[in-house]
Amino acid sequence: MSTGKVVQVIGPVVDIAFEAGQQVPDINNALVIDKGNGQSLTVEVSLALGDGVVRTIAMDSTDGLQRGMGVVDTGNPIEVPVGEATLGRVFNVLGEPVDNNGAIASDVRRSSIHRDAPKYDELTSSTEILETGIKVIDLLAPYVRGGKIGLFGGAGVGKTVLIQELIHNIAQGHNGISVFTGVGERTREGNDMYHEMEESGVLKQTAMVYGQMNEPPGARMRVALTGLTMAENFRDNEGKDVLLFIDNIFRFTQAGSEVSALLGRIPSAVGYQPTLATEMGQLQERITSTKKGSVTSIQAVYVPADDYTDPAPATTFAHLDATTNLERALTQQGIYPAVDPLASTSSALDPQIVGQEHYEVATEVQRTLQRYRELQDIISILGMDELSDEEKTTVNRARRIQFFLSQPFSVAETFTGINGEYVPVAETVRSFKEILDGKYDDLPEDAFRNVGAIEQVVEKAKTMAQ
């Protein structure tokens, strides 16, 4: 093993020199710095500067580092535990348990976090719909088992709540393995998630990996790869169907941009790293389904300043099968989940996949909502009286549809005081077909707000009439 010394520390970036005649570590190798007092710091090689000097990114705080400290090359990239031993546990970026439930046994298999994506001939595609129980998603932007799904939204529009509800609805009914990866998000949310999973009994089938907001950019940059490596092992070596939740994929990009300038790279658009598309591609191409097993990934994507043209969310869009867009204007109307029914997309909304009736109902719902959006300018200037009878009917139905696309979530019961609702796809399609047919035109609009099945609307209308 090569040994070297720390020669420069700039924030999370550490330069290390190896003497002449020693093997210079490869790119992505993990090096261990001895900080004394039994403490060590793991860093990852990013650049070879020449003359035996390498530039590395620290996976933890560089506080207390001094020039001249000894460094050992491990000879391998960061390796994390994989397999059954990871279930029910919480790990950091290095695969070290952080849940105070004891160390992982030394004989547990470990795997490098840097791997090639599966080869083209190993891939497989699926057309099986993944039922979420959330009306707006199942109807208008359905998810595919083994697909890649993005939840896009600005700050505070409900991405994490939606991902928690999807974990509640899918992971609890899914007998396979789940991997949850917290990338640069709030530690409090991670703690809440752990306890909720523990109470619901899902934890024993779940591996959790966290690199949260308070951690250095190195940890936030690599923690997504740690979680993905654990998911890949279940897929490739155990032939399992895996659910991979990532909250938030934007922080992966953000961490890369934080260290990019320190590594000496010239920034590109909006200050992002010039390697943005490459880094995103390397991560996303590994999240896929093969002939051995599937990985269904659900990724929250923060949209800076609600700007979808920002390079980070724009780069992510290209890799996804379905997108669920959360819209701030809908939260202001009190419609939760605040999913934009016209901007959300899915490659699975196809009559050959979802069936002819589902496809026709979904497209008619979108057409009605689009017509309502076009008429809103006329309504705001001239009022409803200027519309034709047909247009008035369209507007009234569109408003009922818009309210009926909301529903109470199980994970938000403590805030709302309303029991969460899970609505099967067949029920969702039938309900919206009946609304489009005018069966419920006489019921008040407010009866459609924040309910599950259409029968609850009828009950609510009766209660309101009393």
From Swiss-Prot:
The entry describes its oligomerization and partners as: F-type ATPases have 2 components, CF(1) - the catalytic core - and CF(0) - the membrane proton channel. CF(1) has five subunits: alpha(3), beta(3), gamma(1), delta(1), epsilon(1). CF(0) has three main subunits: a(1), b(2) and c(9-12). The alpha and beta chains form an alternating ring which encloses part of the gamma chain. CF(1) is attached to CF(0) by a central stalk formed by the gamma and epsilon chains, while a peripheral stalk is formed by the delta and b chains.
Would I find ATP-binding among this entry's keywords? yes
Catalytic activity reported = ATP + H2O + 4 H(+)(in) = ADP + phosphate + 5 H(+)(out)
What is the similarity comment for this entry? Belongs to the ATPase alpha/beta chains family.
Looking up PANTHER family in the UniProt record yields: ATP SYNTHASE (PTHR15184), ATP SYNTHASE SUBUNIT BETA, MITOCHONDRIAL (PTHR15184:SF71)
* Enzyme Commission designation: 7.1.2.2
**TM ranges:** none
Family annotation (InterPro entries): AAA+_ATPase, ATP-synt_VA_C, ATP_synth_F1_bsu, ATPase_a/bsu_AS, ATPase_alpha/beta_chains, ATPase_F1/V1/A1_a/bsu_N, ATPase_F1/V1/A1_a/bsu_N_sf, ATPase_F1/V1/A1_a/bsu_nucl-bd
Tell me which domain of life the UniProt entry assigns to the organism this sequence originates from. Bacteria
Carries keyword ATP-binding?
yes
Q: Top-level EC class, please?
A: translocase
> Where mainly located?
membrane
Under the heading CDD domains, the entry gives: ATP-synt_F1_beta_C, ATP-synt_F1_beta_N, F1-ATPase_beta_CD
Q: What does this protein do?
A: Produces ATP from ADP in the presence of a proton gradient across the membrane. The catalytic sites are hosted primarily by the beta subunits.
User: Which HAMAP family is this protein grouped with?
Assistant: ATP_synth_beta_bact
| Keyword vocabulary terms for this entry | ATP synthesis, ATP-binding, Cell membrane, CF(1), Hydrogen ion transport, Ion transport, Membrane, Nucleotide-binding, Translocase, Transport
Task: Write out the annotated subcellular location.
Answer: Cell membrane
Its source organism is Leuconostoc mesenteroides subsp. mesenteroides (strain ATCC 8293 / DSM 20343 / BCRC 11652 / CCM 1803 / JCM 6124 / NCDO 523 / NBRC 100496 / NCIMB 8023 / NCTC 12954 / NRRL B-1118 / 37Y)
Q: How does it sit in the membrane?
A: Peripheral membrane protein
Q: Per UniProt, where does ATP bind?
A: G153, G154, A155, G156, V157, G158, K159, T160
Query: What is the protein name for this chain?
Result: ATP synthase subunit beta
Which GO terms fall under molecular function for this chain's record?
Answer: ATP binding; ATP hydrolysis activity; proton-transporting ATP synthase activity, rotational mechanism
Q: Name one Pfam family in it.
A: ATP-synt_VA_C
Which GO terms of the cellular component aspect does the record hold?
plasma membrane; proton-transporting ATP synthase complex
